[in-house]
Every structure is written in structure tokens, then in C-alpha cells.
Amino acid sequence: MVAPGRMVTSSRRIGRVTNKTKLIIYRGSDKVDTSAAETVLWDQEAGGAGKDSNKHQHIGATGVESGELLEHHLQAALSSASLLHSSNKPSSPKSVKEAPAAALNYHIPTPDATGLVSDTVFSQLYQRTKYVEPYNFIRFSDTVEESSCGWGGLGYCMDDADERWLNDFNSKAEGSSGDVKSDKEQGRGMRVKGKDREKEKGDAPAPLVISEDMFEYIMGVFEKYTEENAPMLHTDLSLLPPFSAVENMFSTPISPAFLPSNEIPKELGDLKACARMARNVYPHWKSRREQRQGKSILPQLNYDETNDNDPYVCFRRRDIRATRKTRRTDNFSIEQFQKLQFELRSAHALADRVLTREREKKSLYEAEKELWEARWKFFETKRRWPSLGMTSDEEHKITGRPTIVPPIQIPSLSGQTPLTSGQSSSHMRKRTDKDREERAQRERYDAQRNAERSGILSGRSNAPDALKERLQALQQKTEEMLARKKEQDAHWDDSIDSPYQPLPPSNSVHAFRSLFVLDPCRAQCKDSETGNEILHPESFRIRRGRGGIVRLDRRTSIYSHRRGIQPTSPSEYPTWLFPDIAPRRSEKKRPRSIDEVEEEMQEQSPKAMRKDLNETWRYDVDRGGAVGVGMGLEEDYDRVIIDDLEAKYIRHRISLLQESDCAKLRPDNYILDQTREALDAAADAKPPPAPIFQKPPAPQPNPQLLAAHLQQQQMLAQQQQMEQFQRFQLMAQQQAMAQAQAQAQAQAQAQAQAQAQAQVQAQGQGHPQAHLQTHPQGVSQPNGVNSPMPNGQQMLPPSDGVKQLKLPPHAVARLGAAMANANANANGGLHVLQQQQQQHAQTSQQ
């Protein structure tokens, strides 16, 4: 251990202790000068003298860091201690009188570490025994808090107040259980009956004693439930949960997820007793909570480090713990542990499966042993009573070997092609040989079985006569019961014996008339050659076809043929199995002579008979032969014909009609009843209430305003027509003026050319120069620009007024025609506008 030392008061900096610092360890037997020891600080980081060096401050004379010397509680405790120390000093050195003991006004509660322990107390606390570390020292990795928790991991620990209440409760419970007074003390001199005495014993409840562990468990459940459901109880005590809300935690099995250990404690016992205990503990817990002002009964440590100035924070870190980085070696070790865990789990699963397999094998062997013993007992019973006999099933149960029974060979009916004579003979020979071998094998097996039975069951029968008489009596009684049952059911039809109910014949069958109705003597006739009876006589019906044509339909008679020997060819099986429905060829058409009938009967082969049979089944609608879409014999070839004798249709008809089936055949009056109810409801219905808010009526049109509006529209239309007419006139005038101006220019040019030619002819003999001087080509204008003179003549300036023009007669005529057309168009447009206005006025008035 590091030697305790005095507080260093020097101002020099003490070297911090790191993982590389060498320390001196003193033992109890060593003599150490405590005044020479120094107090050092542990440095978690070797390089902490850098940016965090200001946090590692020197420890002063008070034993705390210099940064915490100004803490309020520490200063108050130091001041109180200094006052106490000053008051204990004597007033003078020579005075012997002791000063009165003074108490600290404020102190920090710390355990008293002053003084030395006596040898007797030390020997009791620290015995001189050698510690031996066990081989299973490390068992689990739970923390101290987890290890010290109670049932279910709940961390409630009872204090002195809880202990006093629990002792009082248990003492009262034990005292109340022993206060049962006797009959003599109660003054009852009469004797009590046994039933009353038992009743009194049953009415006395068992004493309810609560153990400390059970008390801590109940209080822990109350605390955890309140912490989860009422975390703000310290602000409002009305949120305290009642006992009815917590009773289900004790009267019913508690959920493992509610407990911190996720395991239900095995020591709980009966739930009813647990609920009684919780009901008695609840008032005490409630009072403790109210005393704590809704806070937890056990004070909670403050681990919140957000506020550095809070002095009540427990286990504060002096230095910021550095974040440790994950290294490759750590990952490797983790991977190795994971691999080891996977291998151990695989080995455990494999061992578990092997154990399961061996258990199944054991159960299988036990079952086989029981089966063998049952067979042996059954065999002994048969051997002791040989009169009981032995069947093939019983022999199979005893020996375990099934009896080989050859299957019955039935020729296949799927073949349609008859075999030839050579193929048929070879097939019959092979089948005969095979049957002979199977018969010989079966005979040998029967002989061997009879020999074994005669060897095992040989000797005289040991069955007593009483057993035989009893068997005969049982057989006679059974026969009498069957006869009596038959007499009772004589007038009843058993639906189990005949479950099939044939369908009623169709209307087409009723329309056919048999020849027996016309000639009753033919009903007793038979076939003269074979003597076969007639099953279905020949019948006819008359029907009217399309176009009013009368048609006669007939059905030939069907005879009951005799069944001969079993055929050898598969093609002969349909005729041999169903002879009654295979009509002969002579029955399908009208014979012409007797010789023809005999020849047809002789020439008809089994193949032809099978073909006729297939055709009959295919097209016979009454027998269900025509099945599918488009197989009908009527005009509607697309109708679907089904087989009424098929299993999915016949299963609805094999039982008798019930009352519910008859109800389905009646008409449904639901729609009529519903309609009648609706009419009655409409007749009795009250008129709808008048609405509170009604829509205001539309305003009536004012005829004066309409007339004024119509007149204004007419005036606007007339004004638009006048403007359009004036526009047309102006356009016509402009066109006429342009034409007149063009004609005037053309005439002026023609006159100028004529005058120029005349002058040239008159003065043709003159000098050219004089001619040029006398008649210049251009006249100078005031602005200095010479005006052109076409053909030696100066052009006149254009006239701006219309009055200066004088139009020729043809231009005047053309202008008049254009103006007349414009007036006609304007008058026509005005007439159309007036008609539209009149129609609009009529529609608005309507």
C-alpha cells in the first residue's frame, strides 16, 4: 500500500504518478516515518501536461484542490472546525480547568479514522487465516449493484423504518393467530357437533407472515411501477397509483420483461398469498411516498455531469476520459472469441441432437418390445383355445408376414382392336400357365400353413363347454335382434339400401306411344329364336316440323339378351357385360324380307355390335350419351347437354326432399311485400317541413325598361347602318375621282404631244442653236431645281379640288352605276338588320 503522508505545503510542483512511475510499498511490519511521506496524484494520461495542464492543480493544506477551496459547504465546515478548535484552547497556560465541549455547527459527515484499533478488536475483524484462491473464482461479470439486488433484480433495500413496520406486522399476525378462544372461555357449555367444529377450523385464516425478501420484492414492484407510469409524481401527489392498478402485478403471473433480470423469482409461491401481502404493504408504501413528497423512497445518486458547479454530483471525473480507438489486435481477439463461441454452440447442438436420437431409439425399442409381448400373448391365447380359429389377419399380426394373395387378372377394356386368332391363342396360353403357377404356389403355401397349424395346435381342444354354449347363445340373440329389426322396418323404405332416386322422364318420352297400347297381345311376345324378353317395346310419336310438315319418330324395341360364356377377346366384353342395351342390327332398320334378316344376323360381328353400341350411347340424349357443347339434337346446336347421372349432379338427388327444398320451389314474395311496405309508408308519411330559408322569387321584368332598351338598340343599329352607308359612298367617290384624274392626265399628255409636233413642223427650217436658246429644255425653279418638260412642254401642277375636273360622259356613266350598286347593297343590309331586330324583340317579349 502507498504510505499515507502529510499534505505538502510547498509551492513546488509534484511529479504526477503515471503507469511508469516507481512507487515504494510499505508493509505493516515496516517502520515508516509518516512525516517524510508525500501525497501524490494519479495521472490517467502520461502526456496530460499539455493543453489540459490547467486542470491538474496542486493540492493545498486543506487536502483538496485549489480550484475547490471556494466551495460553499467546504468553507462552512472549515470555519466551524476552526471555531471549535479555538474554543477548546485554555485561557491561560497555567489554568487546569477544562473548557466545556462544544459541538460543530456545520460539518461534512466522514467516518472517524483517528486513533488505533485495539488488538482484540483487530483480531476479531482480521483473523490470521491464509487465503487460498479457489479455482472457480471468476464466475460471472455482474456488477456489485446487480449482485446485491433482490428477487427479480429489483434494487429496493429496506431501511430502519421498513424493518420496524415489518416486525410490528409480523408480531400482530402471529399474535392474532394464537388468540383463538376455546369454547369454555366463551361460556359455551354445550358440545359442538363435528361439522361445526370443522367449519370453525376452516374459517380461521392462516397467519400472514411476510419475510424480508418478500417485503423488498413487493416494495420494489411498487417503486418500479410508479417510476414507469407516474414519473412526475413529485410534482403532483394525486398521480399516486391506487392499489387496484397494481393488484394485477401480484394476483396474476407477472411478465418477465417487467423485471430487470427478465426472470420470475421462484420463491414467490401462491399468487393469492402474494396479493394479500401486497394489499397489507401498500398503505405503508403509500405513507413513505407521501413523506418523501412523491420522490423515490431510496435516495438516488446524482450522476448528471452537465453542471460542473453542482456539488452533489457523485463520482465526478477529474479529467476527460479519452476516447479509446479500436485496434487491430482488439478486432482479432473479438473474432477469436466469436469463432470459439460458434464452435461451442455447434458442439452443444450436435450433442443435443445425438441425445435426442438416442432417446427416440430407446422409445422405438420399448414400443417394439411391447408389440412383441402383445403378439406372444395373442399367440398363447390362440394356442390355448384352438376352437377360436385363426384368420389371415390374425396370422399376419402374429408372424408379421403378410399373406400373398395373387391379384385377379381382368382383361383390359381399353383396347378397341380385336386380336387375331393366333395372338388370342398365345395370350390365352400364357395366362393359363401363369394361373397354374400361381395356383400351385398358393396350394403349397396353404399346405405349409395347415401343417404348421396342425403341429402347433395339435391335440384335443381345451375349450370348455360353457364357452361354446355362451357363443351359441350370443349368436342366437344376434339373429333374433336382426329378425325383430326386420319386422319393425317392414313397411319402411331404407334410403341406405336404395339411395338413388331416378329422374322423372322428359316430355319427349311421354309423347312416345308404345305399340302395346294399340296391340296388347304383343306385350307377351318373345323372340322366336332366342326367347329374349322385350325390355322397351317399339314406340312412335307424331310431331309437326318446320313448314307444317308432319313427322313420325319411332324407337325400336330392346330385348333382354342371354349372357353366354365369358368372352376371350376384350372387344367382346361390352356386349357381354351390357347385353340389354346393345340392340341388334335388324332392330335399327325396317327389314325387307325374312331372308335379309337372317343373313344380317349371321353376318353381324362383335366389332359391328360394339360400334352400334357406341353410336347408341353417343347420340342417345335420354341416356346421357350426348354431353358437351353443340351435341344437341334440336335447332339450337349451341346448347350445353350434361350427364344427369354424373356424381356431381346426382349427389343432390340421392336424398329425399326436405321442407326447405319445397320452400325453394314456392315463389318469393319478398319483392311484393317490400313494395307494399313502401307504398304504405309513402301514404302514411308526413309532408316535408317547410324550409326556413326560401329562395327569393325572380324579379319581374319592367315593360317600360324593356321598350326603352329595345328602342336604344334599334337607334344604335340604325346609326351603324348610316355610318356604313356613308363609308360606302365615300369609297365610291374616291374611286370615281381617281378614274377622272387619270383620264384628265391622259388627255393633257395627248394635247401636249399634238402641239409639240405642230411646232416642230412649222419651224423645221430654223438654226439648231437658236432653237436651243429660244426653247430651253428646263425652266429654273425658285429652289434651283429644273422641272422636267416632257416633249419640250412644261407640265401643269396637279389640281387639288374635285370641281376643277371635268369627267367624260363614259366616266360619269360608270360612276353613276357604282353609286347605284352601293345604295342597293346598303338598303339590303339595312333591311336584314331590321328583320333581326324584330325577331329579337319578339323572343324577348315571349
From Swiss-Prot:
Residues 411-426, 774-796 have a biased composition (Polar residues). Pfam families: EPL1 (PF10513). One of its GO terms (cellular component) is NuA4 histone acetyltransferase complex. Residues 180-203, 432-452 have a biased composition (Basic and acidic residues). Residues 759-773 have a biased composition (Low complexity). Residues 434-490 form a coiled coil. Keywords: Cell cycle, Coiled coil, DNA damage, DNA repair, Nucleus, Transcription, Transcription regulation. GO terms for biological process: DNA repair; regulation of transcription by RNA polymerase II. Residues 169-204, 391-466, 587-609, 682-702, 759-804 are annotated as: Disordered. Residues 686-702 have a biased composition (Pro residues). It comes from the Eukaryota. It is found in: Nucleus. Component of the NuA4 histone acetyltransferase complex. Belongs to the enhancer of polycomb family. Component of the NuA4 histone acetyltransferase complex which is involved in transcriptional activation of selected genes principally by acetylation of nucleosomal histone H4 and H2A. The NuA4 complex is also involved in DNA repair. Involved in gene silencing by neighboring heterochromatin, blockage of the silencing spreading along the chromosome, and required for cell cycle progression through G2/M. This is Enhancer of polycomb-like protein 1. It comes from Cryptococcus neoformans var. neoformans serotype D (strain B-3501A).
